[in-house]
Regions:
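Sec-dependent N-terminal signal peptides
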Residues: 11-17
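C-terminal motif of bacterial Sec signal peptides marking the signal peptidase cleavage site
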Residues: 19-21
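Acidic, Ser/Thr/Pro
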Residues: 24-168
Length: 168
């Protein structure tokens, strides 16, 4: 009878140990952080804020930082030429083309008559610009803003431009 009692006690001890072992709290698995891209909106960039002259074309480089979903180029420009009496005239003779070109388009433009543009305002002397630009994801993108005196007449044109790149 003693053998049965000892055997029973062993079984009870075994069951109690197993039961308490199952109820022991498990260590929490460590949370692995999910890779997230922090979206920080860069400050506005003044692409051009000045008055300058153009014979053939004048270029301004701009770079859209990576991870910008809604870049925008906005502002205005006016063009002038000097008339026969030396007076400043703002008329159709002062017209220029404003082109926004990516790197490949700009390369085509300077090495021949490039036809493709990202954005353009053509044959104008007084223009308000509000262009949505392509989003950037993992890499920044470079663009070229080109004021083009396509007709070449008059030979020199004066441009007063105020254009800003923002990242709403």
């Amino acid at each position: 009878m003693l053998g049965r009692s000892a055997n029973k006690s062993l079984w009870i001890a075994f069951i109690l140990l197993a039961f308490t072992g199952c109820n022991r709290s498990q260590p929490k698995p460590e949370d692995t952080p999910t890779a997230m891209v922090q979206s920080v909106i860069p400050p506005e960039q003044h692409v051009v804020q000045k008055t300058f002259s153009v014979q053939k074309y004048q270029t301004f480089e701009l770079t859209i930082p990576e991870h910008c979903l809604h870049p925008r180029l906005h502002g205005d420009f006016k063009t002038f030429h000097y008339g026969e009496q030396g007076n400043r005239a703002n008329d159709d003779a002062a017209n220029v083309d404003l082109l926004l070109l990516d790197e490949q388009q700009f390369n085509d433009f300077i090495h021949g008559p490039g036809e493709e543009t990202t954005r353009s305002a053509q044959n104008t002397h007084d223009q308000v610009i509000d262009w949505a630009l392509p989003a950037t994801f993992g890499n920044p993108r470079k663009f070229f803003l080109v004021f083009n005196n396509a007709t070449g007449k008059p030979k020199i044109k004066i441009i007063d431009a105020n254009l800003t790149l923002s990242f709403d």
